[in-house]
């Protein structure tokens, strides 16, 4: 694969490569690959270990519970269970010593107008921290979302994992 541009930051050990299909951001102990076609990370490697067992993706679906019985059929009519992401534009710049990947995309079901329009930024620090900022606009013609999130399917052997689902505070 031929890379179009390569850029090192003034900060220690942050390297960014760009091709037609991906951005590769690497530092002293990490390498992250962002797929420009899907708008998601495909590889997150830290200390030589791949953390993902599948590429990341954005999702709104979850299995309905008994409490969802009144809205479940609306979710199914809206085809929320068949949602996929369409990526329109991606970019990567160096800002304040960090790599900033931007992505404009939408989530929609086949033959249905977009449910969500997403402007996402992924900020990667020279130490390997990934921060996300997303502006998500829901189409008012669709029912309430079951959920919205980024799915990261981790390796099965990972046992000690922390995450923040709805922010850093109790929810």
Q: Where in this protein do the model-derived segments appear?
A:
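Beta-strand/loop-rich accessory regions of lumenal/periplasmic or secreted enzymes
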Residues: 2-171
């Amino acid at each position: 694969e031929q890379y179009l541009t390569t850029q090192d930051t003034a900060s220690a050990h942050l390297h960014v490569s760009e091709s037609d299909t991906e951005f590769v951001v690497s530092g002293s102990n990490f390498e992250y690959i962002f797929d420009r076609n899907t708008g998601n990370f495909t590889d997150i490697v830290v200390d030589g270990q791949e953390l993902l067992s599948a590429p990341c993706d954005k999702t709104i679906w979850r299995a309905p519970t008994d409490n969802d019985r009144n809205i479940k059929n609306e979710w199914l009519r809206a085809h929320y269970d068949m949602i996929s992401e369409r990526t329109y534009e991606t970019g990567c710049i160096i800002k304040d010593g960090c790599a900033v990947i931007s992505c404009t995309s939408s989530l929609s079901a086949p033959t249905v107008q977009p449910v969500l329009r997403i402007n996402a930024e992924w900020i990667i620090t020279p130490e390997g921290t990934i921060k996300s900022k997303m502006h998500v606009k829901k189409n008012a013609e669709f029912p309430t979302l079951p959920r919205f999130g980024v799915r990261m399917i981790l390796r099965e052997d990972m046992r000690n994992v922390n995450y923040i689902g709805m922010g850093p505070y109790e929810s």
